[in-house]
């Protein structure tokens, strides 16, 4: 058995597709009416559809998990993030951990936590 995809719930699937394309270069693999699979295995699920499956509330900014990306030129990434999405909500501005890795954490458009760090 292997992990196939990671699914995140989004309010506006088209805005989210653009967000992940703009920042991370993810392209559309499959559009299945409220469910989009992007390259790298990320799945965007329309919130209304997801709620109908689970019959549970969606809790944005729950901070219980994160999407983790690595970027060699993190300063360039931060510049792109600030230019394309100037109102993005940061959890941690660009910082350096005690082990030397530089990271930034922020929420996507729907409160899903994202971390971008330099390669370890």
Question: Where in the sequence are the language-model features?
Answer:
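N-terminal beta-strand motif that seeds the catalytic metal site of vicinal oxygen chelate
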Residues: 1-15, 65-67
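Vicinal oxygen chelate
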Residues: 13, 67-113
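Conserved short beta-strand elements that form part of the metal-binding/catalytic scaffold
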Residues: 27-61, 113-118
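Short glycine-enriched loop/turn motifs at secondary-structure junctions
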Residues: 1-2, 59-64, 97-98
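Short beta->alpha transition motifs characteristic of CBS
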Residues: 8, 46, 98, 105, ...
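Short secondary-structure junctions
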Residues: 25-30, 87-91
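Short beta-strand-to-loop elements that line the ligand-binding cleft
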Residues: 8, 29, 93-96
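Amphipathic alpha-helical segments
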Residues: 14-26
